[in-house]
Amino acid sequence: MKIKLILACALMVFSAASSAQRIKDIANVQGVRSNQLIGYGLVVGLPGTGEKTRYTEQTFKTMLKNFGINLPDNFRPKIKNVAVVAVSADMPAFIKPGQTLDVTVSSLGEAKSLRGGTLLQTFLKGVDGNVYAIAQGSMVVSGFSAEGLDGSKVIQNTPTVGRIPNGAIVERTVATPFSTGDHLTFNLRRADFSTAKRLADAINDLLGPGMARPLDAASVQVSAPRDVSQRVSFLATLENIEVEPASESAKVIVNSRTGTIVVGKDVRLLPAAVTHGGLTVTIAEATQVSQPNPLAGGDTVVTSDSTIDVSEADNRMFLFNPGTTLDELVRAVNLVGAAPSDVLAILEALKVAGALHGELIII
């Protein structure tokens, strides 16, 4: 497989980083973030695709008890249309009580499908244990499953996970430090000392010297007005200032599981000669049965016939001259017919030899 397409896409990604970008595209305001919510609930109304586990029965009995219906402790309800689920949602910053959230509903037990089910009222809690939203409603399930009496089964997508658009109502807000203090802090999404300095300089050019100062490679602190309305206008102006991020350091990123290789445009090679030969050993086993004539009194014998074939690829050596660029590397690799797995071995060897100018990252 040729790797030109992957490398060409990488060139576009790395070259795009050199153009000016708005602050809002490269940094976040510290403290302004979403919060994860989670809850435990029941889905009812399933067409026989629910579950009959002990904890499902216990949850079902607890729900009935909350409605004033008490069942004997030794009674086991026969329920096939109920499933226990985990309900999760992301709560954006500044969302207010009465607004709604999309929720994801995932089966916790052995339910075959959640299609056709309805989530009953479920409390969604934050990491502090407080309830921030309440979810309820009919689910949208994209997957489905069907099973025959002979055990045959058809499953498409994931029938045990569903979504409820606007399925949760926010009951409580999350406090943010946005409206407190004398400063705002921008956190870069990709930490870089040069970019942090450029961001601070761009703000100081607009507002005046000393208004912004970089704290480290990822954070820039800006003096801000105390009045909330002024702070909103202040931030609306700052987030649209354009900053040219520093170019990325030379990197080669390799996914050893998929064979994907991404090479940055600044990667260079020192003089090196590379040859990559492949030795292939193929062993084929065939089983033969010797069945004698019934009247001969012989025994049936099972024998194995092994065939071993050894072949070695006739690959050529290629030479990297000083300052070899990405394009030249791609042409050289394709010339010898190397697959992505072969390229990984070549890059690792070049890095060990000190001939690869760039960081080799294997994920």
UniProtKB/Swiss-Prot annotation:
Keywords: Bacterial flagellum, Periplasm, Signal. It is found in: Periplasm; Bacterial flagellum basal body. Pfam families: FlgI. GO terms for molecular function: structural molecule activity. Its main location: periplasm. Assembles around the rod to form the L-ring and probably protects the motor/basal body from shearing forces during rotation. This is Flagellar P-ring protein. The gene is flgI.
